[in-house]
């Protein structure tokens, strides 16, 4: 039905007859000549119909937006005065000689030109129209090219694309599972995988030493701008490779991808330990474009008569950190109050501050409600450590170390945006040496997952003293976003059982939930390591989209619903009966 895509026609085709198909982007009747902008996935082209062919002209005059049509005509160069530099095809146009309406379009339920006027609900309900917009189409085309590039790289490096099951067994991986009832095993359920983690480890045990898969994963969790109930991972696993080798290989892949797709050289990725990242930036995925850093000052404040500072300064689990904002002395009291409310979202009880109005005047040139509690030598040392200058403000976080990191880390990001401080377009890094465990309500939890190997300890040593142990784990971070994370895996039964026990999983419970894994670990398991990248997030960053919903063809809403298909929906009662499922209505409590 076509000889060319609309966006592919150029000056080299002048004088040729072409056949095009697509949708009417816009139609204009200007003084007896109809100008038609025809659109397909590759772009727009202008088609001109004049009254010399009355039958064709009359049909062209009836066209409205989103009619699906076939056009036949002659490519000609536009006059210099009519060249449109904003269009890929702006140097040429097609003189229409034939026109077929393939399918008419009703009046549209959403705006194609001013899509900002469409609600998110409208865009998802009529997604097939929303995806016709060039911006959306180009993102999906870009995504297809990215996955093709990734496959080429992994294929050429000896990785095998192997599928793993979608219907599997529920395992504790941090989020709720989507459950699928079994008809043949009444009362029993499959789970949709949160990741192929255990199956890819089993593939390593099976001898397939380089595996990859671009795979759907599922998590029933509260959604944010960068989360969806179903999402896509670039999943990778290797045998007989160290964490350094895995990082080197996947860094090579990511650098090649950015060079191919964006002509961006990311350069060599720096390494940073988890502890350094939390200390300097208050985050395990720091945005290095932001020059602001947290500075520890607790050692200066242990003796001050101000409990807000001295309390955390003398607490082993406390922290006092300072954050200098260049030019921040211009902040009004209301703006400082807004920052105080902002850190309160993250558990901070307040936000002390110090304005450096004129450094040459000593204490006289410094304004702060806490200045009366600090002697001159302490103030001078705070100014020195933070490298504060006249016109700056220093903000203070004092609380439990976790609260200070989270609240001041978030404030660092906000201030960096507010003061336009971000430097450079792309700043990647590896974050390494994560803690093996974290304590929540007195119980140990895996920081990554229960199959991550510790670094440099035996099973007995780990179980005897699990606190402060470091895992052989690594995250790739770009511009404050985690692109992917991975680790060396546990490859012997003794260590895996020890980790389960530390996590409060009894030997009996471990056998019930992970018996197949523990059994497999008995038969010559090779050392193995891997990682998984979030494909949707990578595409979001590379295209500049504000949400992963804008780089997925048919995403869900923030309430995990699909307005297009009205999913989820009620099941047929007969189906429920076959599955042995009864729907229990939530009881409504009434007062007597």
Swiss-Prot record:
First-listed, main subcellular location of the protein, grouped into a coarse class: cytoplasm
Ligase recorded as keyword: yes
Keywords recorded for this protein, A-Z: Aminoacyl-tRNA synthetase, ATP-binding, Cytoplasm, Ligase, Nucleotide-binding, Protein biosynthesis
Region (Aspartate): 197-200
Compartments (UniProt record): Cytoplasm
InterPro entries reported in the protein's UniProt record: Aa-tRNA-synt_II, aa-tRNA-synth_II, aa-tRNA-synth_II/BPL/LPL, Asp-tRNA-ligase_1, Asp-tRNA-ligase_1_N, Asp/Asn-tRNA-synth_IIb, AspRS_core, GAD-like_sf
Entry binding sites for ATP: 219-221, 228, 482, 534-537
UniProt GO MF annotations: aspartate-tRNA ligase activity; ATP binding; nucleic acid binding
Pfam families per the UniProt record, alphabetical: GAD, tRNA-synt_2, tRNA_anti-codon
EC number: 6.1.1.12
CC per GO annotation: cytoplasm
Catalysed reaction, written as an equation: tRNA(Asp) + L-aspartate + ATP = L-aspartyl-tRNA(Asp) + AMP + diphosphate
Residues engaged in binding L-aspartate: 173, 219, 448, 489
Disulfide pattern: none
Entry keyword annotation includes Aminoacyl-tRNA synthetase: yes
GO BP term, pick one: aspartyl-tRNA aminoacylation
Family statement drawn from the similarity comment of this UniProt entry: Belongs to the class-II aminoacyl-tRNA synthetase family. Type 1 subfamily.
PANTHER family named among the record's database cross-references: ASPARTATE--TRNA LIGASE, MITOCHONDRIAL (PTHR22594:SF5), ASPARTYL/LYSYL-TRNA SYNTHETASE (PTHR22594)
Function text: Catalyzes the attachment of L-aspartate to tRNA(Asp) in a two-step reaction: L-aspartate is first activated by ATP to form Asp-AMP and then transferred to the acceptor end of tRNA(Asp).
NCBIfam families named among the record's database cross-references: aspS_bact, PRK00476.1
Subunit field text: Homodimer.
Protein name in UniProt: Aspartate--tRNA ligase
């Amino acid at each position: 039905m076509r000889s060319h895509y609309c966006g592919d026609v150029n000056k080299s085709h002048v004088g040729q007859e072409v056949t095009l198909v697509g949708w009417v982007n816009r139609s204009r009747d200007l003084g007896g000549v109809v100008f038609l902008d025809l659109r397909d996935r590759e772009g727009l082209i202008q088609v001109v119909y004049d009254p010399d062919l009355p039958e064709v002209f009359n049909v062209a005059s009836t066209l409205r937006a989103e009619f699906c049509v076939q056009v036949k005509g002659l490519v000609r160069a536009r006059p210099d005065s009519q060249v449109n530099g904003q269009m890929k095809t702006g140097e040429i146009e097609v003189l229409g000689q034939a026109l077929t309406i393939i399918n008419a379009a009703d009046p549209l339920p959403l705006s194609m030109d001013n899509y900002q006027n469409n609600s998110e609900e409208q865009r998802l309900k009529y997604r097939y129209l929303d995806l016709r917009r060039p911006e959306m189409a180009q993102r999906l085309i870009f995504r297809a090219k990215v996955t093709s590039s990734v496959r080429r790289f992994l294929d050429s490096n000896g990785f095998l694309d192997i599928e793993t099951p979608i219907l599997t067994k529920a395992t504790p991986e941090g989020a709720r599972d989507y459950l699928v009832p079994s008809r043949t095993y009444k009362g029993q359920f499959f789970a949709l995988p949160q990741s192929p983690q255990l199956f890819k480890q089993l593939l390593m045990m099976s001898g397939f030493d380089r595996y990859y898969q671009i795979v759907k994963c599922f998590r029933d969790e509260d959604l944010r701008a960068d989360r969806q109930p179903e999402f896509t991972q670039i999943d990778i696993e290797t045998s007989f490779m160290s964490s350094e080798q895995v990082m080197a290989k996947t860094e090579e892949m990511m650098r090649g991808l950015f060079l191919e797709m964006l002509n961006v050289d990311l350069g060599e990725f720096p390494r940073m330990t988890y502890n350094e990242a939390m200390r300097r930036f208050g985050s395990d995925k720091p945005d290095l474009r932001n020059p602001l850093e947290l500075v520890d000052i607790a050692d200066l404040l242990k003796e001050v008569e101000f409990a807000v500072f001295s309390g955390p300064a003398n607490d082993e689990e406390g922290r006092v950190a300072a954050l200098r904002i260049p030019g921040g002395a211009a902040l009004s009291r209301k703006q400082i109050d807004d920052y105080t409310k902002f850190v309160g979202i993250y558990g901070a009880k307040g936000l002390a501050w110090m304005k450096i109005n004129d450094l040459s005047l000593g204490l006289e040139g410094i304004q702060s409600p806490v200045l009366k509690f600090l002697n001159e030598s302490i103030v001078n040392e705070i100014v020195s450590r933070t490298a504060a200058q006249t016109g700056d403000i220093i903000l203070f976080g004092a609380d439990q170390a976790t609260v200070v990191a989270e609240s001041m880390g978030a404030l660092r990001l906000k201030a960096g945006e507010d003061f336009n401080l971000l430097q450079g377009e792309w700043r990647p890094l590896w974050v390494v040496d994560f803690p093996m465990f974290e304590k929540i309500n007195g119980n140990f939890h895996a920081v990554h997952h229960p199959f991550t190997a510790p670094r440099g300890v035996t099973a007995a040593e780990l179980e005897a003293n699990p606190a402060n142990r470091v895992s052989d784990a690594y995250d790739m971070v770009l511009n404050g976003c985690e692109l992917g994370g991975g680790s060396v895996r546990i490859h012997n039964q003794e260590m895996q059982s020890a980790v389960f026990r530390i996590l409060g999983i009894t030997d009996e419970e471990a056998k019930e939930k992970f018996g197949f894994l523990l059994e497999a670990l008995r038969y010559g398991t090779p050392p193995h390591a891997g990682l998984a990248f979030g494909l949707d997030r990578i595409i979001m960053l590379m295209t500049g989209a504000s949400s992963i919903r804008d780089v997925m063809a048919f995403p869900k809403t923030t309430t995990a619903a699909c307005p297009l298909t009205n999913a989820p929906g009620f099941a047929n009662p007969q189906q429920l009966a076959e599955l042995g499922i009864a729907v229990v209505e939530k009881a409504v409590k009434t007062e007597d």
